[in-house]
C-alpha cells in the first residue's frame, strides 16, 4: 500500500469524525452473489426514489455490482454489527458463508435481503460515474421495505456504535 499524502491522511481523519449509517449492499445475478459493508450511501431524490452509493474501484464487488446491475441496500440495525464485520472483510468468513450465517431472504430478481434490517432498498443501477478512486452509483429504487423502529448502527471514529432509537412516551 502506498504512503498517503498529508492532505489525503487529513481527509481520512476528518471523515472518521463523520458519523454514518452502516449498510450492507448486496447483489445477485450473472456475475455472482456478493455483498459489502458501506457507509457512503445517501438519498438523492424521492421522485423517483434514488440513492447514491460510492464503491472503491479496486473492490471486487465493484465489477460484480456493475455487471449484475441490481442492488439491495440493507440498512443495518444495532443488532447487526457482526453482519457488518463479515461483509467489511474484518473476519475470515468467505462470501457464501456470510449469507448462511444470518437470516437472508430472496428479494426482487433474487437480491439478498437481510431480514430484520431497518430498511431494505432494492433497485437497479441507473447511472455510474467514475470519480477518483471510487465509482458513484445512482440506484433507482423499485422496492422499499422499512421497519417501524429499531436501534441503528453507525460508524464513527473508525468503529461501530449502536445508536439507540428514542422510545415513544406511553
UniProtKB/Swiss-Prot annotation:
Applications (biotechnology): HpaBC can provide a biocatalytic synthetic approach to the production of hydroxycinnamic acids that is an alternative to, or complementary to, conventional methods such as chemical synthesis and extraction from plant sources.
Gene Ontology terms, MF aspect: flavin adenine dinucleotide binding; flavin reductase (NADH) activity; FMN binding; NAD binding; oxidoreductase activity, acting on NAD(P)H; riboflavin reductase (NADPH) activity
Superkingdom per UniProt: Bacteria
SUPFAM superfamilies membership: FMN-binding split barrel (SSF50475)
Signal peptide stretch: none
Record EC number: 1.5.1.37
Keyword Transport: no
Record's catalysed reaction(s): FADH2 + NAD(+) = FAD + NADH + 2 H(+)
Oxidoreductase is among the record's keywords: yes
Activity regulation annotation text: The rate of FAD reduction is independent of the presence of HPA, demonstrating that, in contrast to HPAH from A.baumannii, the activity of the HPAH reductase is not allosterically regulated by the substrate.
Pathway(s) where this gene product acts: Aromatic compound metabolism; 4-hydroxyphenylacetate degradation; pyruvate and succinate semialdehyde from 4-hydroxyphenylacetate: step 1/7
UniProt-listed InterPro entries: Flavin_Rdtase-like_dom, HPA_mOase_red, NADH-dep_flavin_reductase, Split_barrel_FMN-bd
NCBIfam families, per the entry: HpaC
Record function comment: Reductase component of the 4-hydroxyphenylacetate (HPA) 3-hydroxylase. Catalyzes the reduction of FAD by NADH. The reduced flavin is then transferred to the oxygenase component HpaB. Is also able to reduce FMN and riboflavin, but preferentially binds FAD. Has no activity with NADPH as the reductant.
Subunit (UniProt): Monomer. HPA 3-hydroxylase consists of a reductase component HpaC and an oxygenase component HpaB. Some form of interactions between the reductase and the oxygenase facilitate the transfer of FADH(-) to the oxygenase in P.aeruginosa, although interactions are not required in other species.
Family statement drawn from the similarity comment of this UniProt entry: Belongs to the non-flavoprotein flavin reductase family. HpaC subfamily.
Protein name according to UniProt: 4-hydroxyphenylacetate 3-monooxygenase reductase component
Amino acid at each position: 500500500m502506498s504512503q498517503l499524502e498529508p492532505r489525503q491522511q487529513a481527509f481520512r481523519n476528518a471523515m472518521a469524525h463523520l458519523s454514518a449509517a452502516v449498510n450492507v449492499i448486496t447483489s445477485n445475478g450473472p456475475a455472482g452473489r456478493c455483498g459489502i459493508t458501506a457507509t457512503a450511501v445517501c438519498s438523492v431524490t424521492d421522485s423517483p426514489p434514488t440513492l447514491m452509493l460510492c464503491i472503491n474501484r479496486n473492490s471486487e464487488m465493484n465489477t460484480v455490482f456493475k455487471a449484475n446491475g441490481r442492488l439491495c441496500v440493507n440498512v443495518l440495525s444495532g443488532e447487526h454489527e457482526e453482519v457488518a464485520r463479515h461483509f467489511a472483510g474484518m473476519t475470515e468468513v468467505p462470501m457464501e458463508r456470510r449469507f448462511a450465517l444470518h437470516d437472508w431472504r430472496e428479494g426482487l430478481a433474487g437480491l439478498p435481503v437481510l431480514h430484520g434490517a431497518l430498511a431494505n432498498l432494492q433497485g437497479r443501477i441507473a447511472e455510474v460515474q467514475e470519480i477518483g478512486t471510487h465509482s458513484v452509483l445512482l440506484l433507482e429504487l423499485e422496492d422499499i421495505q422499512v421497519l417501524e423502529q429499531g436501534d441503528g448502527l453507525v460508524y464513527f471514529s473508525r468503529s461501530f456504535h449502536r445508536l439507540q432509537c428514542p422510545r415513544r412516551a406511553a
